[in-house]
C-alpha cells in the first residue's frame, strides 16, 4: 500500500487552476469614419509573446500577450489596436526539471490559447469589427525552433 502511494506521489501532473485577463486595451482611433468607408481587406500586424513566471513551488503563471494593429489595406488608416495579456495559474508537480521548460512553453500555452483567441475575437466584435480570428499556434514547433537556435548560439 505504501508503495502505491509513493508511485502516485511521484506521478508527474499539471493542471490549469485559474484563468484571468491581466491587461486589455482596445482602441479604434479612426472611428466613426472607418465604419462609413467602403470595406477592403485589412492589413494585420500581430505579435504574440509567451511569458512564464514561477509563483511558488507548485504554481506557475503562464501568460500570452497579444499586440495587434489592424489597418486599412493601404496602411494609412488604423482600424483598431488590440492589446491583451491573458494568463493562467498552472499547478505543476513532479515534472522532471528537463521536461519543465517544454510543459511551460508547449502544454500550458496550448491549453490557454483557445480562450485567449476567443477574448480577442469577442473584443473586436464588441468594437464594431469582424471577429479577429488568429490562426492556431504550433507551440511545439516554436519551442523546438527556440531550442535549435539556442543550441546553435552555444555552439558558436
Curated annotation (Swiss-Prot):
InterPro entries the UniProt entry points to: SecB (IPR003708), SecB-like_sf (IPR035958)
GO CC entries: cytoplasm
A Pfam family of this chain: SecB
Predominant localisation class: cytoplasm
Keyword vocabulary terms for this entry: Chaperone, Cytoplasm, Protein transport, Translocation, Transport
Subcellular location: Cytoplasm
Segments passing through the bilayer: none
Molecular function via GO: unfolded protein binding
Signal peptide segment: none
The keyword NAD appears for this protein: no
GO biological process: protein tetramerization; protein transport
Family per similarity comment: Belongs to the SecB family.
Subunit structure: Homotetramer, a dimer of dimers. One homotetramer interacts with 1 SecA dimer.
NCBIfam families referenced in this protein's UniProt entry, alphabetically: PRK05751.1-3, secB
Purpose of the protein: One of the proteins required for the normal export of preproteins out of the cell cytoplasm. It is a molecular chaperone that binds to a subset of precursor proteins, maintaining them in a translocation-competent state. It also specifically binds to its receptor SecA.
The protein, known as: Protein-export protein SecB
Native species: Desulfotalea psychrophila (strain LSv54 / DSM 12343)
